């Protein structure tokens, strides 16, 4: 009878060889033949390894909870394996990292690596279920830990904790913040392609460079810091550890820049949720569940994303009075599956219902140009806890922009610019455009004079607009007086 050590050495060599040949095997061998061979090999392996219960297998799937959420353990184990695979694995997968000068190498799919922990040999293998295997499609990717049964205590009580701890430390060291966007539900046919796509988050906005009143910026920063330290407090008051921010104001006032500044200040990932591509309420719930903690979920221009406004509520009442609700639903069915069926109640439940407590330390931000158009239920305190008005550019915000764009903190034109900014409404984006040098010859003086000229033109337009408005009002008054006289004569 073979000794356990002999079997173990044979197993390690065999698994490494199989993982090396596996991609070619899947590519060139027909599926029906593969299925037969795999069943035969499985029977052999069962007899070889499981007959005396010498080996234990622990599987760590990529997704947990019936595929609803990403497994943290899977990610942490992946980080751990990436640190040891470079020198040991035959096949590696290369990934770019913004925080590293070189490529990050990790264990490739369908590959195995042998690890020694306190004198104990274990095998880690990475597996991807064949997409043609419909019965196991929910397995997706998974990592398997194999070890001898008599080492069960040290593996389950010590080694796994060691792996997860190492994985967390590596993640913090090499953390690269991401900007996510949800995939169009009509563009992917299989769940393993993922609900979210991501790119590195490289926006460099900060509160220091944000064109806004200094006191207001400090107030927002203090609120954010208080939130990040509020884990115990939120648990004490029995509330999910999340906070909602509503950014509202005219176009160009810096709402998107504010989001980037918040993300950089907290070092959070950003999930840009495009509601119009979400199929229905169930898919919206899955998207929210698939977001991680220490993140910001953003819905920009929410008044334009879906019909979630007060106008929709009034229209619905009119439709019910005219008994047109059924007809509208029929038309919706005919329009096909590409139209989003997300409802206001579905959105409210996703951000503030029972499922919202499934992940901690999360900020939800809505932006809108027209806050009065939004349904009051959507922006009430408790959902959108902090309302931040992004207003037109005034003198304090101008000074921040002048320092950022021109490295200038004083000029003879500051007084005139401050006076004009109080008289006209211009966005920080418009001011920044005038302050930005257009050529190498443009110095601070040229840029400030260009801004003054632009502000004077805006003031002229404002005066002309008010004059036209007053003229029309006077004409309307004269017209109304004539109508009243005629009406009085007819009455007599």
From Swiss-Prot:
Membrane-protein topology: Single-pass membrane protein
Transmembrane annotation, as ranges: 7-25
CDD domains, sorted: RecA-like_BCS1
Main location: membrane
GO biological process: response to stress
A single Gene Ontology CC term: membrane
Keywords attached to this entry: ATP-binding, Hydrolase, Magnesium, Membrane, Nucleotide-binding, Transmembrane, Transmembrane helix
Cofactor: Mg(2+)
Amino acid composition bias (Basic and acidic residues), ranges on this chain: 323-332, 462-484
Disordered: annotated segments: 313-334, 462-492
One example GO MF annotation: ATP binding
Subcellular location as annotated: Membrane
Enzyme Commission number(s): 3.6.1.-
Reaction(s) catalysed (UniProt annotation): ATP + H2O = ADP + phosphate + H(+)
Annotated binding of ATP, by residue: 249-256
Classification via InterPro entries: AAA+_ATPase, AAA_N_dom, ATPase_AAA_core, Mitochondrial_chaperone_BCS1, P-loop_NTPase
Pfam family, one: AAA_assoc
Keyword Transmembrane: yes
UniProt record similarity statement: Belongs to the AAA ATPase family. BCS1 subfamily.
Name this protein carries in UniProt: AAA-ATPase At3g28520
């Amino acid at each position: 009878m073979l000794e356990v050590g002999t079997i173990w050495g044979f197993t390690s060599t065999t698994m490494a060889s199989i993982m090396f040949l596996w991609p070619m095997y899947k590519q060139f061998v027909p599926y029906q033949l593969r299925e037969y061979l795999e069943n035969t090999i499985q029977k052999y392996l069962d007899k070889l390894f499981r007959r005396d219960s010498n080996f234990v297998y622990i599987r760590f799937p990529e997704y947990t909870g019936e595929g609803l959420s990403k497994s943290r353990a899977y990610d942490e184990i992946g980080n751990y394996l990436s640190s040891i695979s470079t020198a040991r694995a035959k096949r590696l997968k290369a990934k770019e990292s913004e925080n590293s000068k070189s490529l990050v190498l990790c264990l490739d799919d369908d590959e195995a690596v042998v690890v020694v922990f306190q004198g104990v040999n274990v095998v880690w293998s990475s597996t991807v279920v064949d997409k043609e295997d419909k019965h196991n499609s929910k397995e997706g990717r998974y990592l398997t830990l194999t070890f001898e049964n008599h080492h069960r205590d040290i593996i389950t009580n010590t080694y796994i904790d060691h792996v997860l701890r190492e994985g967390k430390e590596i993640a913090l060291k090499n953390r690269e913040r991401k900007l996510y966007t949800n995939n169009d539900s009509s563009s992917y046919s299989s769940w393993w392609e993922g609900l979210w796509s991501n790119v590195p988050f490289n926006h460099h906005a900060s509160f220091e460079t944000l064109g806004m009143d200094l006191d207001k910026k400090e107030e927002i920063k203090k609120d954010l810091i208080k939130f990040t330290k509020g884990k115990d407090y939120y648990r004490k008051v029995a509330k999910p550890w999340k906070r909602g921010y509503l950014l509202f104001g005219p176009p160009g006032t810096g709402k998107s820049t504010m989001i980037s500044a918040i993300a950089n200040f907290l070092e959070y990932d950003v999930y840009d949720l495009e509601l119009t591509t979400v199929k229905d309420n169930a898919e919206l719930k899955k998207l929210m569940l698939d977001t991680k903690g220490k993140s910001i979920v953003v819905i920009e221009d929410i008044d334009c994303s879906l019909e979630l406004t007060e106008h929709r509520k009034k229209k619905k009442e009119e439709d019910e009075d005219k008994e047109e609700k059924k007809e509208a639903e029929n038309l919706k069915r005919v329009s096909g599956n590409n139209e989003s069926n997300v409802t206001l109640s579905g959105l409210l439940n996703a951000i503030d219902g029972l499922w919202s407590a499934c992940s901690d330390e999360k900020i939800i931000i809505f932006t809108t140009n027209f806050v009065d158009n939004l349904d009051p239920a959507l922006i009430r305190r408790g959902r959108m806890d902090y309302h931040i008005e992004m207003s037109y550019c005034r003198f304090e915000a101008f000074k921040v922009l002048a320092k950022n764009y021109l490295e200038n903190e004083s000029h003879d034109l500051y007084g005139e610019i401050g006076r004009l900014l109080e008289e006209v409404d211009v966005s920080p984006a418009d001011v920044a455009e005038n302050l930005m040098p257009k050529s190498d010859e443009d110095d601070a003086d040229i840029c400030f004079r260009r801004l003054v000229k632009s502000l004077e033109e805006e003031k002229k337009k404002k005066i002309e607009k008010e004059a036209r408005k007053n003229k029309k009002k006077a004409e309307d008054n004269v017209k109304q007086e004539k109508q009243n006289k005629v009406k009085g004569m007819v009455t007599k």
